[in-house]
Amino acid sequence: MKVLWAALVVTLLAGCRADVEPEVEVREPAVWQSGQPWELALSRFWDYLRWVQTLSDQVQEELLSNQVTQELTLLIEDTMKEVKAYKAELEKELGPVAEDTKARLAKELQAAQARLGADMEEVRNRLSQYRSEVQAMLGQSSEELRARLTSHPRKMKRRLQRDIDELQKRMAVYKAGAQEGAERGVSAIRERLGSLIEQGRLQALASQPLQERAQAWGEQMRGRLEKVGSQARDRLEEVREQMEEVRVKVEEQAEAFQARLKSWFEPMMEDMRRQWAELIQKVQVAVGASTSAPSQEP
């Protein structure tokens, strides 16, 4: 579409181009047939330039006024507004897309949009410049005026065409990303619905009558208590058996120790009794001898 604008601007700037070179036929892009608001705005921009072209001999007089640049300013603003609105709509559709992908697409589209706006501004500025040149060239011949007005149009046409193609390509990528995001969103919704269905099933189980749940809970607790009681009884029986084994071992060890002590001390006590008896006997003998000696002295 920008190419179309550029071509129109070129022919507009050419003024009375019929005597200089054949009119360049410009084909309207097929993309306008989709009817997007921003494309319709660009179409209006194109229609206005084409209308200016039909002024033929009146072009010089129109360029001397501010009407053309004012109209172009309004059309540029409308076009940029529609492009931004369409971009915002695509951004909403890109919700489920990864943030890095969304940021990259937005950056590329913003750059293409900026280039389009800059070139449209240049078209308007060129017209203002040509209007000033026309004012300065009053009195010159029509051929000289036409030659000045046709100096830049071809370059502007190529630039606008390139920008339009770039913007359309970015829009297509952006829309493809939005469709991909929508598909991911549907998958996420499907998974969410599955989760909600599962939760609903669990809630249905949880909504059983309170009495049934209490009865089930009571049976469960009784089963657990019986299991714990059985385990406790088994454990106590094991402990009792272990204690009995320990008692028997202690008694056996005590009897063995007592027997060892008896085997140690009985010979010793017997020897001490024997020695003590011998000592007493010796003392008695000594005492008896000492008592018999005084009786024999008179």
From Swiss-Prot:
Key word Cytoplasm present: no
Transmembrane annotation, as ranges: none
Keyword Transmembrane recorded: no
PTM text: APOE exists as multiple glycosylated and sialylated glycoforms within cells and in plasma. The extent of glycosylation and sialylation are tissue and context specific. Glycated in plasma VLDL.
Modified residues (Phosphoserine): 141
Subcellular location per the Swiss-Prot or TrEMBL entry: Secreted; Secreted, Extracellular space; Secreted, Extracellular space, Extracellular matrix; Extracellular vesicle
Modification type Methionine sulfoxide: residues: 137
Span list, region 8 X 22 AA approximate tandem repeats: 74-244
Gene Ontology cellular component terms for the protein in this record: chylomicron; extracellular exosome; extracellular matrix; extracellular space; high-density lipoprotein particle; intermediate-density lipoprotein particle; low-density lipoprotein particle; multivesicular body, internal vesicle
Annotated signal sequence range: 1-18
Domain of life: Eukaryota
Alphabetical list of Pfam families matching this protein: Apolipoprotein
Major localization class: secreted
Alphabetized GO MF terms: cholesterol transfer activity; heparan sulfate proteoglycan binding; heparin binding; identical protein binding; low-density lipoprotein particle receptor binding; phosphatidylcholine-sterol O-acyltransferase activator activity; phospholipid binding
Chain's role: APOE is an apolipoprotein, a protein associating with lipid particles, that mainly functions in lipoprotein-mediated lipid transport between organs via the plasma and interstitial fluids. APOE is a core component of plasma lipoproteins and is involved in their production, conversion and clearance. Apolipoproteins are amphipathic molecules that interact both with lipids of the lipoprotein particle core and the aqueous environment of the plasma.
Family: Belongs to the apolipoprotein A1/A4/E family.
Assembly and binders: Homotetramer. May interact with ABCA1; functionally associated with ABCA1 in the biogenesis of HDLs. May interact with APP/A4 amyloid-beta peptide; the interaction is extremely stable in vitro but its physiological significance is unclear. May interact with MAPT. May interact with MAP2. In the cerebrospinal fluid, interacts with secreted SORL1. Interacts with PMEL; this allows the loading of PMEL luminal fragment on ILVs to induce fibril nucleation.
Protein name: Apolipoprotein E
Provenance organism: Cavia porcellus
Classification lineage: Eukaryota, Metazoa, Chordata, Craniata, Vertebrata
